Amino acid sequence: SWVKFNMAMILPANTADENVTMMLSTPEEIIAEARAGRMFILVDDEDRENEGDLIIPAEFASTNMINFMAKEGRGLICLALESHRCDQLGLPMMVTRNTSRHETAFTVSIEAREGVTTGISAADRAKTIAVAVDDDTHAHDIATPGHVFPLRAKEGGVLVRAGHTEAAVDISKLAGLKGA
């Protein structure tokens, strides 16, 4: 049976390839999902990474959302940020020479300086994200390293780099939210 996941269809693992049907949403539908604080799956071209990422605008990154991403997505919990916000938080790049295939712009990992325990729980990571996107947060409110992995979006968004990082920031901004 099909499971509806905010405008994207997820198929059971045993679905045969010839039976796969993908339903893609319009940009307007995805922007509406973001504005409403609902998670969506962002997919890229099969000639690029050929993957889908679970995306939620950072303002809505609750403990439950982070827990779902960690359990079901089974990947890193990343935080796409505009470059000026990375600068405000004093986040240097993770490496000085990025040799990854798509040049994903990881900064050093982060943690909220206060209000977290070990940093790894879904609640702690949600708190870290909330602190990082709060307009009143400054560099001294963030500790490094941590358990959230910020990604620095290129200025100019998807018009400059067709990556999930830039798309996540652009969609949030088009939804009237913070670029994160």
Regions inferred by a protein language model and the residue ranges of each:
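Catalytic domains of riboflavin
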Residues: M7-A180
